[in-house]
């Protein structure tokens, strides 16, 4: 993804038999790749959960707190750290360095872990408030990778990827800039005022 200039989300799975050194080496490898290519948007620190495919035990809270803190310390500040709030106690981890709650939906299931429902919006708002994070819809591509005129004010652009003039392909840039209802909606979400925005009273 980095060599191709694609903004990318990656992560580590916690509780599959790895040790502390494995976790640290994985996080440092992600950092090194981002320093080389500038493409890592966020790192998901995901705990394993019991399901029909595995008998791994879910990591305890102290383990998750430590791994999240390791991720925040290892990664550059522009790379977000996230935990899936339907799999981890996000409210107990927000003080350890998470700054994104990931792709959640009040209207769909978690297709990867369907037995684990998304928290409701009020629950997510409480977690976001506890961490001082705004709770709002965002695009899959982080704001720093968006083109001029779409990227929100105050967000510095990521340096252009090697061998390309932009992070977003021309067809996607055209879609975002379109004058129709879909283009307007995408631009609204990019600014943080999309239709599913949840604001405090």
Regions found by a protein language model. Give the residues of each.
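A generic short-segment signal for beta-strand/edge and adjacent turn/coil regions
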Residues: 12-15, 72
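Canonical radical SAM enzyme core domain
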Residues: 15-22, 88
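Radical SAM/AdoMet-radical enzyme domain recognition
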Residues: 1-10
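Short gly/pro-enriched beta-turn/loop segments at secondary-structure junctions
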Residues: 9-11, 38-39
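Glycine-rich beta-alpha junction loops
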Residues: 14-17, 47-49
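Auxiliary Fe-S-binding modules of radical SAM enzymes
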Residues: 24-28, 34-201
